């Protein structure tokens, strides 16, 4: 999974961003569960998921701050 560019994330609607954030949080939960039960083989998925989550949360925070400033 390639990391999305910030410009690609900014093109998403607020609803899409929220939906993706929820999906990634669920995925991280599942990954932690798989790791605890020793079923996880691709540990690099943690980093990819956390990075994408951080990008989405950053764009979401930027939008909320710009809306509050307006």
Swiss-Prot record:
Molecular functions per Gene Ontology: structural constituent of ribosome
Q: Which SUPFAM superfamilies match?
A: Ribosomal protein L29 (L29p)
Q: Mind listing the UniProt keywords for this protein, alphabetically?
A: Ribonucleoprotein, Ribosomal protein
Family per similarity comment: Belongs to the universal ribosomal protein uL29 family.
Would you say which domain of life the source belongs to? Bacteria
Protein's UniProt keywords contain Ribosomal protein: yes
Q: Which GO terms describe its cellular component?
A: cytosolic large ribosomal subunit
Spell out the protein name for this chain. Large ribosomal subunit protein uL29
What organism is the protein native to?
Prochlorococcus marinus (strain MIT 9303)
NCBIfam families recorded:
L29 (TIGR00012)
Q: What's a BP term from Gene Ontology annotated to this protein?
A: translation
One Pfam family assigned to this protein is Ribosomal_L29
């Amino acid at each position: 999974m390639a990391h999305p560019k910030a410009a690609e994330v900014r093109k998403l609607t607020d609803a899409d961003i929220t939906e993706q954030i929820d999906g990634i949080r669920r995925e991280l939960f599942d990954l932690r569960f798989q790791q605890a039960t020793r079923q996880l083989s691709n540990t690099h998925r943690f980093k990819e998921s956390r990075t994408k989550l951080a990008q989405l949360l950053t764009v979401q925070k930027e939008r909320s701050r710009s809306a509050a400033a307006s």
